[in-house]
């Protein structure tokens, strides 16, 4: 059982990426300025109340996951919130893991990086190792290159899970395909450099934002990509 925590606004998406496939829709706000976010105190109280209730009912979570409709590391109090979560986890369900789903762009901030290194599972996005594909697929609102993202991910020294979404089709009249030989070759080289504990490979499963004709990648193709990762000695997980 996973207990999800959303640090973004309830009624809008807060993210510095605007991924063309995002199930949360298009990004309306790319920074936290002027946005009302749950306070560290509110998150602490809500999490403690939920964990206490689960303890009373004998329902233990396997993992406490920071995800939601946006990028959790954009919350200005994420280091303290993670510290609070670890304390509460240890108090109520010490066997549960804490996970963060992130696009890794905030890893260059020392306090954020140190906070993420404390959690059990960092599940971090890398949809491509090519600059142009990142620009089209992820549409970051800052100038960030594939090399910068890869260097960010290398800072975890293998203590992370890479999550990659593969898709094909068209978006705003442009061909979309991050499964070409060129894409896979560059991506595999990046995976080898990062040397993660695991790679999660998946494709779209829900409706995507308007403006595109995006297609799922067949399971057989995903499994083939996974087999190439396995040859690097890295564990893989395929879904979709």
What is the role of each PLM region?
Residues 21-118:
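Conserved Radical SAM active-site core
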Residues 10-12, 29, 131, 169:
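Short, acidic Gly/Pro/Ser/Thr-rich loop/turn segments
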Residues 37, 143, 215-219, 223:
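Short, conserved loop/turn and helix-capping segments at secondary-structure boundaries
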Residues 74-216:
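Conserved AdoMet/S-adenosylmethionine-binding subsite of the radical SAM
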Residues 1-25, 63-65:
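N-terminal pre-triad scaffold of radical SAM enzymes
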Residues 6-8, 67-69, 165-167, 204:
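Short strand-loop junctions, especially beta-strand C-caps/beta-turns
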Residues 217-240:
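Binuclear metal-ion centers of metallo-dependent hydrolases, dominated by the metallo-beta-lactamase
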């Amino acid at each position: 059982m996973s207990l999800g925590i959303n640090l973004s606004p309830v009624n809008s998406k807060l993210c510095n990426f605007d991924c063309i496939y995002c199930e949360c829709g298009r990004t309306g706000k790319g920074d936290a300025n002027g946005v009302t976010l749950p306070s560290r105190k509110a998150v602490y109280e809500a999490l403690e109340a939920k964990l206490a209730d689960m303890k009373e009912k004998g329902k233990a979570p396997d993992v406490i996951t920071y995800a939601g409709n946006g990028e959790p590391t954009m919350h200005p109090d994420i280091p303290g919130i993670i510290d609070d979560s670890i304390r509460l986890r240890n108090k109520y369900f010490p066997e549960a893991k804490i996970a963060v789903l992130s696009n890794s762009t905030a890893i260059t901030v020392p306090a954020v990086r140190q906070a993420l290194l404390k959690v059990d599972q960092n599940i971090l996005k890398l949809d491509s190792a090519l600059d142009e594909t990142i620009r089209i697929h992820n549409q970051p609102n800052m100038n960030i290159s594939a090399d910068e993202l890869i260097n960010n991910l290398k800072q975890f020294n293998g203590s992370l899970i890479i999550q990659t979404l593969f898709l094909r089709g068209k978006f705003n009249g442009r061909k979309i395909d991050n499964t070409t030989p060129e894409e896979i070759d560059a991506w595999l080289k990046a995976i080898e450099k990062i040397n993660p504990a695991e790679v999660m490979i998946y494709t779209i499963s829900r409706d995507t934002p308007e403006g595109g004709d995006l297609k799922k990648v067949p399971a057989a193709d995903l499994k083939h990509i996974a087999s190439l990762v396995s040859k690097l000695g890295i564990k893989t997980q395929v879904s979709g």
